Amino acid sequence: MTISIDRPAPVSSWRTYRRLLAFAKPYRLLLVAALIAALIEAAGTTGFLALMKPITDETFIYKNAEVSRWLPVQIILLFVVRGVAGYITDMAMGKSARSIARDLRIKVMAKYLRLPGSRFDSEPVPSMLIRLGSDSDQVAQAAVDAVKVMIQQSLQVIGALALMLWHSWQVTLTILVLAPVLAWVMDKVARRYRRISHSIQESGAQLLQAADQTLSSHQEVKIYGAQQTEMERYGALANRNLRLAMKVESTRGISTATVQMIGAIGLSALLFVAGAQALAGRLTAGDFVVLMTSMLTIIPGLKQLTNVQNMVQRGLASAERLFSVLDSPDEPDQGTVPLTRAKGLIEFRDVTARYPGQVNPALADVSFVAQPGTVTAIVGRSGSGKSSLIKLIPRFYEAEAGQILLDGHPVQAYALADLRRQIALVGQQVMLFDGSIADNVAFGEMRNADAGKLERAILGANAMEFVAQLPEGLQSHVGTKGGRLSGGQRQRLAIARAMLKDAPVLILDEATAALDNESERLVQDALHKLMPDRTTLVIAHRLSTIEHADQVLVMDQGRIVERGTHHQLLAQGGLYSHLHGMQFRERQA
């Protein structure tokens, strides 16, 4: 019933990057503009370096007054053009990067909503949030921000090298002997960054998951005095994250020092060869200054090109995590049988379902029929398979064997959207979204429901008595996860949502298990208004609430061990009678 989420299989950096660049295609005009501007910016840098010769020779050696007058103007114009080009590059690249991050978030979010329910059992939500958050940002950095640095610095290095070749090819070729060593260093740095980046991403997800678990359960943590234990666990994860981060810093520090050392060797070689050229009369002071300033421009450029490998490799690691989601198979949805409104005939035929890694099945050879308009109660001890059974009907999970039929057709024969339109669900844990009461009741495909139907649904769910007392009525905000409302109020809004949907199949998953007596009475009254003329499946904890069910299925260890009406099962004196007797004695006590 579930699938495992494995670490993405390693693929080549170029293959991942090429796939990533496909997301940049819609912004190619922006990127072309950025490239042209980057070329102009690099040309501006090279032009400034070229001016070092007339500045030195004409101003300080030959005392040329005319050159001294126009050089400052040239420098100002050069930097104005360079500044405008740099601004265009930054804006175009920035817009592209942020747009790619947005597109990735939307695409991955849409993909998550198409994945089977088993995915949400095997991947924690904090891991999903990491993918939608920092992973998307780092991918955008790899796709565009890193490219910006690489283009800018590469063009500046190429421009400076070209200028050096123009002024002295002998000096330049002497320095280029060091290029293979530099390429080897950059390759080693890239490999190490990529290896560490995968671990850092996983460590960040584990940190977020641990914080989510602890903070979401803060009451339990405090009442059981688990603050120290949880802090030790979180601290251990934070320390691991720190160790990985320090590996990145160590790699950056070593690579920077190595590049600087190679640069120093190159600079020393330049001084030695240039000195010999000058003594031979083949190099002027201006030529030497151009060579020196060009070399001083190349060294920080090479340093940035080495350091950008961290950004690239972290982005590629994030891209692989995102692509592993995008490459996951969607929920199977090949149904073609048309379905407008079902009659509500539900049939299970020898259904078996199993969680991965489990020897015993969650459900084993389950068979029953729920006739249209009837109430089928499903009872049993915790872990007996009740929730697993009802999750198969809307195909949140798929059965391993057997068939589930709706109106005589396997549920797989219908399109998922059509199948789920036939089902309303009211669970024990009601999820409300941070919006108004009206938004939460008229939810999803019901968002355009007219005001009259909306009010009738809220009235029918016994919710109007508290909604009317709120300052903004139906437009009152419920807070995050409905935190401004009580449990009973949230439950009644869930019933109103189900009433507004008016689906032929109703699933109630322990809808009153966690309520006080008064709230339970109001909710039960609302449910009695909701259930007529629908096929209703009720998972019941309190057996007193299902005494009038048309049939009761008693489950134990994934099997239906008893079935019949409430009175028939009491007369049998089996498991149902035992559970009923226990609850009766508890109420008397």
From Swiss-Prot:
Keywords: ATP-binding, Cell inner membrane, Cell membrane, Lipid transport, Membrane, Nucleotide-binding, Translocase, Transmembrane, Transmembrane helix, Transport. Its EC number is 7.5.2.6. GO terms for molecular function: ABC-type oligopeptide transporter activity; ATP binding; ATP hydrolysis activity; ATPase-coupled lipid transmembrane transporter activity. It is found in: Cell inner membrane. Its main location: membrane. It is a multi-pass membrane protein. Belongs to the ABC transporter superfamily. Lipid exporter (TC 3.A.1.106) family. In MsbA the ATP-binding domain (NBD) and the transmembrane domain (TMD) are fused. PANTHER family: ATP-BINDING CASSETTE SUB-FAMILY B MEMBER 10, MITOCHONDRIAL, ATP-DEPENDENT PERMEASE MDL1, MITOCHONDRIAL. This is ATP-dependent lipid A-core flippase. It comes from Xanthomonas axonopodis pv. citri (strain 306). The gene is msbA.
